[in-house]
Protein backbone atom coordinates (compact mmCIF):
# COMPACT_ATOMS: atom_id res chain seq x y z
CA UNK A 1 0.00 0.00 0.00
CA UNK A 2 1.39 3.41 -0.95
CA UNK A 3 2.68 5.56 1.92
CA UNK A 4 0.30 8.41 0.99
CA UNK A 5 -2.69 6.07 1.34
CA UNK A 6 -1.46 4.84 4.73
CA UNK A 7 -0.98 8.42 5.86
CA UNK A 8 -4.50 9.36 4.76
CA UNK A 9 -5.98 6.37 6.59
CA UNK A 10 -4.05 7.28 9.73
CA UNK A 11 -5.33 10.86 9.59
CA UNK A 12 -8.90 9.67 9.03
CA UNK A 13 -8.65 7.34 12.02
CA UNK A 14 -7.39 10.19 14.22
CA UNK A 15 -10.30 12.36 13.09
CA UNK A 16 -12.78 9.63 13.94
CA UNK A 17 -11.17 9.10 17.33
CA UNK A 18 -11.70 12.80 18.03
CA UNK A 19 -15.36 12.45 17.02
CA UNK A 20 -15.74 9.43 19.29
CA UNK A 21 -14.36 11.44 22.19
CA UNK A 22 -16.72 14.33 21.39
CA UNK A 23 -19.70 11.95 21.40
CA UNK A 24 -18.57 10.53 24.71
CA UNK A 25 -18.37 14.00 26.25
CA UNK A 26 -21.89 14.75 24.98
CA UNK A 27 -23.17 11.64 26.74
CA UNK A 28 -24.19 10.03 23.45
CA UNK A 29 -21.92 7.02 23.08
CA UNK A 30 -19.84 6.18 21.30
CA UNK A 31 -20.43 2.51 22.25
CA UNK A 32 -23.95 1.78 23.46
CA UNK A 33 -25.14 -1.16 25.53
CA UNK A 34 -28.36 -1.84 23.60
CA UNK A 35 -31.10 -0.34 21.45
CA UNK A 36 -34.75 -1.35 21.19
CA UNK A 37 -35.81 -1.62 17.54
CA UNK A 38 -39.47 -1.84 16.63
CA UNK A 39 -38.91 -2.88 13.02
CA UNK A 40 -36.36 -4.19 10.56
CA UNK A 41 -35.89 -2.29 7.33
CA UNK A 42 -37.35 -5.00 5.09
CA UNK A 43 -40.51 -5.12 7.20
CA UNK A 44 -40.95 -1.36 6.90
CA UNK A 45 -40.46 -1.45 3.13
CA UNK A 46 -42.97 -4.28 2.72
CA UNK A 47 -45.60 -3.14 5.21
CA UNK A 48 -45.75 0.47 4.01
CA UNK A 49 -45.43 0.09 0.26
CA UNK A 50 -48.82 1.82 -0.09
CA UNK A 51 -47.63 5.14 1.38
CA UNK A 52 -48.00 7.80 -1.34
CA UNK A 53 -45.37 10.36 -2.36
CA UNK A 54 -45.19 13.32 -0.01
CA UNK A 55 -47.27 11.61 2.68
CA UNK A 56 -46.35 10.91 6.29
CA UNK A 57 -47.66 8.09 8.45
CA UNK A 58 -47.83 9.05 12.10
CA UNK A 59 -46.55 5.70 13.28
CA UNK A 60 -43.55 5.84 15.59
CA UNK A 61 -40.84 3.42 14.46
CA UNK A 62 -37.37 2.65 15.75
CA UNK A 63 -34.70 1.10 13.53
CA UNK A 64 -30.99 0.43 13.91
CA UNK A 65 -28.18 -0.34 11.52
CA UNK A 66 -25.01 0.84 9.84
CA UNK A 67 -24.81 4.16 8.00
CA UNK A 68 -23.80 3.26 4.45
CA UNK A 69 -24.02 6.70 2.82
CA UNK A 70 -24.78 10.29 3.80
CA UNK A 71 -25.68 13.55 2.05
CA UNK A 72 -25.88 16.81 3.99
CA UNK A 73 -27.55 19.80 2.32
CA UNK A 74 -27.85 22.71 4.72
CA UNK A 75 -30.73 22.06 7.10
CA UNK A 76 -31.58 18.73 5.49
CA UNK A 77 -29.63 15.49 5.32
CA UNK A 78 -30.26 12.02 3.92
CA UNK A 79 -28.57 8.91 5.31
CA UNK A 80 -28.83 5.35 4.03
CA UNK A 81 -29.23 2.93 6.93
CA UNK A 82 -28.58 -0.80 6.41
CA UNK A 83 -29.49 -3.70 8.65
CA UNK A 84 -29.33 -7.42 7.91
CA UNK A 85 -32.58 -7.38 5.93
CA UNK A 86 -32.07 -4.37 3.67
CA UNK A 87 -31.82 -0.58 3.65
CA UNK A 88 -33.98 2.44 4.32
CA UNK A 89 -33.43 6.15 3.93
CA UNK A 90 -33.24 8.43 6.96
CA UNK A 91 -34.77 11.86 6.36
CA UNK A 92 -33.04 14.33 8.67
CA UNK A 93 -34.67 17.71 9.19
CA UNK A 94 -32.82 20.16 11.47
CA UNK A 95 -35.91 21.67 13.06
CA UNK A 96 -37.44 18.30 13.91
CA UNK A 97 -34.26 16.81 15.36
CA UNK A 98 -33.31 19.91 17.34
CA UNK A 99 -36.80 20.16 18.81
CA UNK A 100 -36.55 16.59 20.06
CA UNK A 101 -32.99 17.15 21.32
CA UNK A 102 -34.12 20.01 23.55
CA UNK A 103 -36.50 17.66 25.38
CA UNK A 104 -34.65 14.35 25.18
CA UNK A 105 -31.29 13.90 26.87
CA UNK A 106 -30.61 10.66 24.97
CA UNK A 107 -30.77 12.37 21.58
CA UNK A 108 -28.30 14.74 19.94
CA UNK A 109 -28.76 17.78 17.73
CA UNK A 110 -28.81 17.94 13.95
CA UNK A 111 -25.33 19.46 13.84
CA UNK A 112 -23.95 16.77 16.12
CA UNK A 113 -25.52 14.08 13.96
CA UNK A 114 -24.23 15.47 10.68
CA UNK A 115 -20.73 16.29 11.91
CA UNK A 116 -19.97 13.43 14.31
CA UNK A 117 -21.65 10.46 12.60
CA UNK A 118 -19.82 9.02 9.57
CA UNK A 119 -20.49 6.33 7.00
CA UNK A 120 -19.71 3.06 8.73
CA UNK A 121 -21.12 4.08 12.12
CA UNK A 122 -23.93 2.13 13.76
CA UNK A 123 -26.85 4.26 14.89
CA UNK A 124 -30.39 3.82 16.18
CA UNK A 125 -33.14 6.26 15.27
CA UNK A 126 -36.76 6.89 16.18
CA UNK A 127 -39.20 8.78 13.99
CA UNK A 128 -42.20 8.57 11.70
CA UNK A 129 -42.52 7.23 8.18
CA UNK A 130 -42.48 9.53 5.19
CA UNK A 131 -42.48 8.94 1.45
CA UNK A 132 -40.35 11.62 -0.23
CA UNK A 133 -41.42 13.45 -3.36
CA UNK A 134 -39.04 11.17 -5.25
CA UNK A 135 -40.85 8.12 -3.92
CA UNK A 136 -38.29 6.95 -1.34
CA UNK A 137 -39.73 5.47 1.84
CA UNK A 138 -37.91 7.18 4.70
CA UNK A 139 -37.82 7.44 8.45
CA UNK A 140 -38.22 11.11 9.34
CA UNK A 141 -35.85 11.11 12.29
CA UNK A 142 -36.86 12.72 15.57
CA UNK A 143 -34.29 11.14 17.91
CA UNK A 144 -31.00 9.41 17.25
CA UNK A 145 -28.34 7.56 19.20
CA UNK A 146 -24.83 6.49 18.24
CA UNK A 147 -24.47 2.74 18.87
CA UNK A 148 -20.90 2.13 17.72
CA UNK A 149 -18.33 4.48 16.20
CA UNK A 150 -16.39 3.14 13.22
CA UNK A 151 -12.72 4.15 13.19
CA UNK A 152 -11.97 2.73 9.74
CA UNK A 153 -13.54 3.76 6.41
CA UNK A 154 -15.76 1.41 4.46
CA UNK A 155 -14.60 0.11 1.06
CA UNK A 156 -15.78 2.13 -1.91
CA UNK A 157 -19.49 1.39 -2.26
CA UNK A 158 -19.36 1.34 -6.05
CA UNK A 159 -16.32 -0.89 -6.51
CA UNK A 160 -16.49 -2.94 -3.33
CA UNK A 161 -13.42 -5.04 -2.60
CA UNK A 162 -11.66 -5.43 -5.93
CA UNK A 163 -8.93 -7.52 -4.29
CA UNK A 164 -10.34 -11.07 -4.11
CA UNK A 165 -7.76 -12.09 -1.52
CA UNK A 166 -8.83 -9.21 0.71
CA UNK A 167 -12.45 -10.36 0.48
CA UNK A 168 -11.40 -13.66 2.02
CA UNK A 169 -9.02 -12.20 4.61
CA UNK A 170 -11.41 -9.49 5.75
CA UNK A 171 -14.75 -11.17 5.23
CA UNK A 172 -16.45 -8.63 7.49
CA UNK A 173 -15.70 -5.90 4.91
CA UNK A 174 -16.89 -8.14 2.07
CA UNK A 175 -20.18 -8.77 3.87
CA UNK A 176 -20.70 -5.06 4.52
CA UNK A 177 -20.38 -4.01 0.88
CA UNK A 178 -21.51 -7.12 -1.02
CA UNK A 179 -25.19 -8.16 -0.92
CA UNK A 180 -24.18 -11.18 -3.02
CA UNK A 181 -21.81 -12.43 -0.33
CA UNK A 182 -24.43 -11.94 2.35
CA UNK A 183 -26.93 -13.89 0.24
CA UNK A 184 -24.40 -16.71 -0.23
CA UNK A 185 -24.01 -17.23 3.51
CA UNK A 186 -27.73 -16.79 4.13
CA UNK A 187 -28.40 -19.55 1.59
CA UNK A 188 -25.73 -21.71 3.17
CA UNK A 189 -27.41 -21.44 6.56
CA UNK A 190 -30.83 -22.20 5.06
CA UNK A 191 -29.40 -25.17 3.15
CA UNK A 192 -27.82 -26.70 6.24
CA UNK A 193 -31.10 -26.30 8.13
CA UNK A 194 -33.05 -27.83 5.24
CA UNK A 195 -30.76 -30.88 5.09
CA UNK A 196 -31.11 -31.50 8.80
CA UNK A 197 -34.88 -31.01 8.64
CA UNK A 198 -35.19 -33.42 5.67
CA UNK A 199 -33.26 -36.12 7.53
CA UNK A 200 -35.00 -35.50 10.85
CA UNK A 201 -38.39 -35.80 9.14
CA UNK A 202 -37.40 -39.29 7.96
CA UNK A 203 -36.47 -40.55 11.43
CA UNK A 204 -32.71 -40.06 11.11
CA UNK A 205 -31.02 -39.05 14.37
CA UNK A 206 -28.06 -36.68 14.42
CA UNK A 207 -25.49 -37.90 16.93
CA UNK A 208 -22.17 -36.14 17.46
CA UNK A 209 -18.96 -38.12 17.15
CA UNK A 210 -15.42 -37.21 18.29
CA UNK A 211 -13.37 -34.63 16.45
CA UNK A 212 -10.24 -35.77 18.30
CA UNK A 213 -9.53 -39.42 17.51
CA UNK A 214 -6.86 -41.93 18.46
CA UNK A 215 -6.94 -43.38 14.93
CA UNK A 216 -7.77 -41.31 11.85
CA UNK A 217 -9.96 -43.45 9.61
CA UNK A 218 -12.92 -43.43 7.27
CA UNK A 219 -11.16 -41.92 4.27
CA UNK A 220 -7.89 -41.93 2.36
CA UNK A 221 -6.49 -38.61 3.57
CA UNK A 222 -3.57 -37.21 5.53
CA UNK A 223 -4.68 -36.10 9.00
CA UNK A 224 -3.74 -33.19 11.22
CA UNK A 225 -1.88 -34.42 14.31
CA UNK A 226 -2.10 -32.96 17.80
CA UNK A 227 -1.15 -34.09 21.31
CA UNK A 228 -3.09 -34.55 24.54
CA UNK A 229 -0.80 -33.41 27.34
CA UNK A 230 -2.49 -35.09 30.30
CA UNK A 231 -2.64 -38.51 28.63
CA UNK A 232 0.63 -37.95 26.74
CA UNK A 233 -1.23 -39.25 23.71
CA UNK A 234 -1.02 -38.36 20.01
CA UNK A 235 -4.45 -37.56 18.58
CA UNK A 236 -5.79 -36.78 15.13
CA UNK A 237 -8.43 -34.37 13.92
CA UNK A 238 -11.06 -36.49 12.21
CA UNK A 239 -10.85 -36.99 8.46
CA UNK A 240 -14.36 -38.49 8.37
CA UNK A 241 -17.20 -39.37 10.74
CA UNK A 242 -17.75 -42.78 9.16
CA UNK A 243 -16.25 -45.25 11.60
CA UNK A 244 -17.92 -43.80 14.69
CA UNK A 245 -21.31 -43.51 12.97
CA UNK A 246 -21.01 -47.18 11.99
CA UNK A 247 -20.34 -48.02 15.64
CA UNK A 248 -23.68 -46.35 16.40
CA UNK A 249 -25.39 -48.60 13.84
CA UNK A 250 -23.80 -51.60 15.55
CA UNK A 251 -25.23 -50.24 18.80
CA UNK A 252 -28.76 -50.26 17.41
CA UNK A 253 -29.33 -46.82 15.87
CA UNK A 254 -30.79 -47.77 12.50
CA UNK A 255 -30.87 -44.29 10.95
CA UNK A 256 -28.11 -41.93 12.02
CA UNK A 257 -26.24 -38.94 10.61
CA UNK A 258 -23.87 -36.15 11.52
CA UNK A 259 -23.36 -32.82 9.79
CA UNK A 260 -20.07 -31.31 10.87
CA UNK A 261 -16.51 -30.22 10.24
CA UNK A 262 -13.86 -32.48 8.71
CA UNK A 263 -10.10 -31.82 8.66
CA UNK A 264 -7.63 -33.08 6.06
CA UNK A 265 -4.00 -32.00 5.90
CA UNK A 266 -3.98 -31.58 2.14
CA UNK A 267 -3.67 -28.95 -0.56
CA UNK A 268 -5.87 -25.92 -1.16
CA UNK A 269 -7.65 -25.03 -4.41
CA UNK A 270 -10.93 -23.67 -5.69
CA UNK A 271 -12.39 -27.09 -4.77
CA UNK A 272 -10.50 -27.92 -1.57
CA UNK A 273 -10.11 -26.38 1.87
CA UNK A 274 -8.32 -28.31 4.64
CA UNK A 275 -11.28 -27.65 6.95
CA UNK A 276 -14.65 -28.36 5.36
CA UNK A 277 -18.18 -29.51 6.14
CA UNK A 278 -19.85 -32.78 5.25
CA UNK A 279 -22.93 -34.74 6.19
CA UNK A 280 -22.65 -38.52 6.55
CA UNK A 281 -25.81 -40.62 6.64
CA UNK A 282 -26.20 -44.31 7.54
CA UNK A 283 -29.34 -46.41 7.08
CA UNK A 284 -29.63 -49.99 8.29
CA UNK A 285 -31.11 -52.63 5.95
CA UNK A 286 -30.25 -50.49 2.90
CA UNK A 287 -27.67 -50.73 0.10
CA UNK A 288 -26.04 -48.29 -2.30
CA UNK A 289 -29.05 -48.40 -4.63
CA UNK A 290 -31.24 -47.16 -1.77
CA UNK A 291 -28.68 -44.45 -1.03
CA UNK A 292 -28.85 -43.27 -4.65
CA UNK A 293 -32.58 -42.74 -4.30
CA UNK A 294 -32.07 -40.98 -0.96
CA UNK A 295 -29.38 -38.73 -2.48
CA UNK A 296 -31.59 -37.73 -5.41
CA UNK A 297 -34.52 -36.97 -3.17
CA UNK A 298 -32.50 -35.07 -0.56
CA UNK A 299 -30.55 -32.84 -2.94
CA UNK A 300 -33.46 -32.13 -5.28
CA UNK A 301 -35.75 -31.30 -2.35
CA UNK A 302 -33.23 -28.96 -0.74
CA UNK A 303 -32.49 -27.35 -4.11
CA UNK A 304 -36.19 -26.60 -4.59
CA UNK A 305 -36.40 -25.06 -1.12
CA UNK A 306 -33.30 -22.89 -1.55
CA UNK A 307 -33.37 -22.06 -5.27
CA UNK A 308 -37.09 -22.36 -6.02
CA UNK A 309 -36.62 -25.08 -8.65
CA UNK A 310 -34.58 -28.16 -9.53
CA UNK A 311 -33.37 -26.34 -12.62
CA UNK A 312 -30.56 -23.92 -11.83
CA UNK A 313 -27.73 -22.13 -13.63
CA UNK A 314 -24.13 -22.62 -12.59
CA UNK A 315 -21.45 -20.44 -14.21
CA UNK A 316 -23.65 -19.99 -17.27
CA UNK A 317 -24.53 -23.70 -17.58
CA UNK A 318 -28.06 -24.95 -17.00
CA UNK A 319 -28.15 -27.83 -14.52
CA UNK A 320 -31.22 -30.04 -14.12
CA UNK A 321 -31.42 -31.75 -10.73
CA UNK A 322 -34.82 -33.30 -11.39
CA UNK A 323 -34.66 -37.04 -10.52
CA UNK A 324 -33.90 -39.62 -11.73
CA UNK A 325 -30.26 -38.88 -12.51
CA UNK A 326 -27.95 -40.65 -14.92
CA UNK A 327 -26.32 -43.86 -13.66
CA UNK A 328 -23.24 -45.37 -15.32
CA UNK A 329 -20.37 -47.57 -14.19
CA UNK A 330 -16.82 -46.27 -14.02
CA UNK A 331 -15.79 -48.89 -16.59
CA UNK A 332 -18.49 -47.79 -19.03
CA UNK A 333 -17.60 -44.11 -18.74
CA UNK A 334 -13.87 -44.69 -19.20
CA UNK A 335 -14.43 -46.94 -22.20
CA UNK A 336 -16.80 -44.38 -23.71
CA UNK A 337 -14.25 -41.57 -23.29
CA UNK A 338 -11.02 -43.40 -24.16
CA UNK A 339 -11.89 -46.64 -25.90
CA UNK A 340 -10.05 -48.55 -23.17
CA UNK A 341 -11.74 -51.66 -21.75
CA UNK A 342 -10.15 -52.18 -18.35
CA UNK A 343 -12.22 -55.32 -17.80
CA UNK A 344 -10.08 -57.01 -20.45
CA UNK A 345 -6.62 -56.09 -19.14
CA UNK A 346 -4.79 -59.08 -17.69
CA UNK A 347 -2.45 -57.10 -15.44
CA UNK A 348 -1.10 -53.66 -14.61
CA UNK A 349 1.56 -53.71 -17.31
CA UNK A 350 -1.02 -54.27 -20.05
CA UNK A 351 -3.30 -51.56 -18.64
CA UNK A 352 -0.41 -49.09 -18.27
CA UNK A 353 0.71 -49.65 -21.85
CA UNK A 354 -2.81 -49.10 -23.17
CA UNK A 355 -3.17 -45.91 -21.13
CA UNK A 356 0.11 -44.55 -22.45
CA UNK A 357 -0.95 -45.25 -26.04
CA UNK A 358 -4.18 -43.38 -25.34
CA UNK A 359 -2.20 -40.33 -24.22
CA UNK A 360 -2.96 -40.69 -20.52
CA UNK A 361 -0.45 -40.28 -17.72
CA UNK A 362 0.54 -43.45 -15.89
CA UNK A 363 1.58 -42.55 -12.33
CA UNK A 364 3.82 -45.06 -10.60
CA UNK A 365 1.75 -44.93 -7.40
CA UNK A 366 -1.17 -46.50 -9.30
CA UNK A 367 0.13 -50.04 -8.77
CA UNK A 368 -2.84 -52.11 -9.94
CA UNK A 369 -5.35 -52.30 -12.77
CA UNK A 370 -8.04 -50.90 -10.49
CA UNK A 371 -5.96 -47.89 -9.48
CA UNK A 372 -5.11 -47.23 -13.13
CA UNK A 373 -8.82 -47.39 -13.98
CA UNK A 374 -9.45 -44.70 -11.38
CA UNK A 375 -6.60 -42.60 -12.82
CA UNK A 376 -8.07 -42.90 -16.32
CA UNK A 377 -11.45 -41.83 -14.98
CA UNK A 378 -10.02 -38.78 -13.21
CA UNK A 379 -8.03 -37.72 -16.27
CA UNK A 380 -10.51 -38.42 -19.08
CA UNK A 381 -14.02 -38.43 -17.62
CA UNK A 382 -14.48 -36.51 -14.39
CA UNK A 383 -14.59 -32.92 -15.68
CA UNK A 384 -17.06 -33.87 -18.42
CA UNK A 385 -19.78 -34.95 -15.98
CA UNK A 386 -21.74 -31.70 -15.93
CA UNK A 387 -25.29 -32.94 -15.34
CA UNK A 388 -25.80 -35.01 -12.16
CA UNK A 389 -24.32 -38.46 -12.71
CA UNK A 390 -23.95 -41.43 -10.39
CA UNK A 391 -20.66 -43.17 -11.18
CA UNK A 392 -21.00 -46.78 -10.02
CA UNK A 393 -18.91 -49.79 -9.10
CA UNK A 394 -15.41 -48.71 -8.12
CA UNK A 395 -12.26 -50.85 -7.92
CA UNK A 396 -11.90 -52.66 -4.61
CA UNK A 397 -8.34 -51.35 -4.16
CA UNK A 398 -9.49 -47.76 -3.65
CA UNK A 399 -12.58 -48.59 -1.59
CA UNK A 400 -11.47 -50.45 1.55
CA UNK A 401 -14.69 -49.77 3.49
CA UNK A 402 -17.19 -50.75 0.79
CA UNK A 403 -18.81 -54.16 0.30
CA UNK A 404 -17.64 -56.38 -2.57
CA UNK A 405 -19.99 -56.19 -5.54
CA UNK A 406 -22.66 -58.86 -5.57
CA UNK A 407 -21.96 -59.81 -9.22
CA UNK A 408 -18.76 -58.05 -10.42
CA UNK A 409 -15.50 -59.51 -9.06
CA UNK A 410 -12.82 -56.96 -8.21
CA UNK A 411 -15.34 -54.15 -7.77
CA UNK A 412 -17.35 -52.79 -4.84
CA UNK A 413 -20.85 -51.44 -4.44
CA UNK A 414 -19.93 -47.79 -4.37
CA UNK A 415 -21.04 -44.67 -6.18
CA UNK A 416 -19.83 -41.12 -6.38
CA UNK A 417 -22.11 -38.32 -7.51
CA UNK A 418 -20.62 -35.81 -9.94
CA UNK A 419 -22.19 -32.46 -10.78
CA UNK A 420 -20.46 -29.76 -12.87
CA UNK A 421 -17.38 -31.98 -13.02
CA UNK A 422 -16.99 -32.17 -9.25
CA UNK A 423 -17.46 -35.03 -6.82
CA UNK A 424 -20.36 -34.00 -4.61
CA UNK A 425 -21.28 -37.23 -2.81
CA UNK A 426 -19.86 -40.67 -2.07
CA UNK A 427 -21.75 -43.78 -0.92
CA UNK A 428 -21.37 -47.51 -0.31
CA UNK A 429 -23.13 -50.67 0.47
CA UNK A 430 -21.14 -50.80 3.68
CA UNK A 431 -18.69 -53.61 4.36
CA UNK A 432 -20.02 -55.46 7.41
CA UNK A 433 -17.90 -58.65 7.24
CA UNK A 434 -15.29 -58.15 10.01
CA UNK A 435 -12.80 -60.63 8.53
CA UNK A 436 -12.89 -59.05 5.06
CA UNK A 437 -12.63 -55.61 6.66
CA UNK A 438 -9.57 -56.63 8.69
CA UNK A 439 -7.79 -57.94 5.60
CA UNK A 440 -8.41 -54.73 3.72
CA UNK A 441 -7.36 -52.45 6.55
CA UNK A 442 -4.20 -54.49 7.07
CA UNK A 443 -3.43 -54.06 3.37
CA UNK A 444 -3.97 -50.33 3.82
CA UNK A 445 -1.67 -50.35 6.83
CA UNK A 446 1.04 -51.95 4.72
CA UNK A 447 0.68 -49.18 2.16
CA UNK A 448 1.00 -46.59 4.92
CA UNK A 449 4.16 -48.25 6.23
CA UNK A 450 5.51 -48.17 2.68
CA UNK A 451 5.07 -44.40 2.59
CA UNK A 452 1.46 -43.74 1.54
CA UNK A 453 0.50 -41.12 4.13
CA UNK A 454 -3.15 -41.15 3.00
CA UNK A 455 -3.70 -44.88 3.52
CA UNK A 456 -5.93 -46.15 6.32
CA UNK A 457 -4.62 -47.60 9.55
CA UNK A 458 -6.06 -50.54 11.45
CA UNK A 459 -8.70 -49.39 13.94
CA UNK A 460 -8.96 -52.35 16.29
CA UNK A 461 -11.94 -50.96 18.20
CA UNK A 462 -13.88 -50.51 14.96
CA UNK A 463 -13.08 -54.07 13.93
CA UNK A 464 -14.23 -55.30 17.33
CA UNK A 465 -17.50 -53.43 16.83
CA UNK A 466 -18.01 -55.18 13.48
CA UNK A 467 -17.44 -58.53 15.20
CA UNK A 468 -20.32 -57.71 17.55
CA UNK A 469 -22.44 -57.56 14.39
CA UNK A 470 -23.55 -54.78 12.05
CA UNK A 471 -26.72 -55.08 9.96
CA UNK A 472 -26.68 -54.51 6.20
CA UNK A 473 -26.22 -50.76 5.86
CA UNK A 474 -26.07 -48.09 3.21
CA UNK A 475 -23.81 -45.11 3.88
CA UNK A 476 -23.61 -41.71 2.22
CA UNK A 477 -21.42 -38.63 2.49
CA UNK A 478 -22.21 -35.27 0.87
CA UNK A 479 -19.82 -32.34 0.64
CA UNK A 480 -21.75 -29.37 2.00
CA UNK A 481 -19.38 -26.71 0.69
CA UNK A 482 -19.52 -27.97 -2.89
CA UNK A 483 -23.29 -28.15 -2.71
CA UNK A 484 -23.39 -24.54 -1.51
CA UNK A 485 -21.13 -23.59 -4.43
CA UNK A 486 -23.66 -25.16 -6.79
CA UNK A 487 -26.70 -23.54 -5.19
CA UNK A 488 -25.09 -20.06 -5.04
CA UNK A 489 -23.30 -20.09 -8.42
CA UNK A 490 -19.94 -19.65 -6.67
CA UNK A 491 -16.77 -20.55 -8.62
CA UNK A 492 -14.53 -21.14 -5.58
CA UNK A 493 -14.96 -22.98 -2.30
CA UNK A 494 -13.47 -19.91 -0.62
CA UNK A 495 -16.57 -17.98 -1.68
CA UNK A 496 -18.81 -20.21 0.45
CA UNK A 497 -16.63 -20.67 3.56
CA UNK A 498 -16.88 -17.57 5.71
CA UNK A 499 -13.26 -17.72 6.85
CA UNK A 500 -11.23 -20.01 4.57
CA UNK A 501 -7.66 -20.98 5.33
CA UNK A 502 -5.23 -18.73 3.44
CA UNK A 503 -1.51 -18.51 3.00
CA UNK A 504 0.17 -16.07 5.40
CA UNK A 505 -0.06 -12.52 4.13
CA UNK A 506 3.23 -11.08 2.92
CA UNK A 507 4.20 -8.03 4.94
CA UNK A 508 5.57 -5.06 3.00
From Swiss-Prot:
PANTHER family: LYSINE--TRNA LIGASE, CHLOROPLASTIC_MITOCHONDRIAL (PTHR42918:SF15), LYSYL-TRNA SYNTHETASE (PTHR42918). HAMAP family: Lys_tRNA_synth_class2. Mg(2+) 1 binds at residues 416, 423. Homodimer. It is an enzyme of class 6 (ligase). GO terms for molecular function: ATP binding; lysine-tRNA ligase activity; magnesium ion binding; tRNA binding. SUPFAM superfamilies: Class II aaRS and biotin synthetases (SSF55681), Nucleic acid-binding proteins (SSF50249). It is found in: Cytoplasm. Its EC number is 6.1.1.6. It catalyses: tRNA(Lys) + L-lysine + ATP = L-lysyl-tRNA(Lys) + AMP + diphosphate. One of its GO terms (biological process) is lysyl-tRNA aminoacylation. Keywords: Aminoacyl-tRNA synthetase, ATP-binding, Cytoplasm, Ligase, Magnesium, Metal-binding, Nucleotide-binding, Protein biosynthesis. Pfam families: tRNA-synt_2, tRNA_anti-codon. This is Lysine--tRNA ligase. GO terms for cellular component: cytosol. Binds 3 Mg(2+) ions per subunit. Belongs to the class-II aminoacyl-tRNA synthetase family. Mg(2+) 2 binds at residue 423. Its cofactor is Mg(2+).
Amino acid sequence: MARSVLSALSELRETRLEKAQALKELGNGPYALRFESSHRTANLQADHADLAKGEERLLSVSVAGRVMARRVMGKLAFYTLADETGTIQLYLDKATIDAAASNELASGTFVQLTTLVDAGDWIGVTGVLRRTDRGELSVKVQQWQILSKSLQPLPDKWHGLADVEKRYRQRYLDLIVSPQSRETFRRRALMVSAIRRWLDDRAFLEIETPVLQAEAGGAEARPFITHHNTLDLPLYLRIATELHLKRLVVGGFERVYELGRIFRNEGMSTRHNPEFTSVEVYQAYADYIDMMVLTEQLISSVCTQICGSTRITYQGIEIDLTPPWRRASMHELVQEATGLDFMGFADRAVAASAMARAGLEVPSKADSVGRLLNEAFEQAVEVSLIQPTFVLDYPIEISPLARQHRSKPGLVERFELFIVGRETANAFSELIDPLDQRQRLEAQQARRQAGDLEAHGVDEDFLQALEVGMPPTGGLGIGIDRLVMLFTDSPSIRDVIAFPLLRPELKT
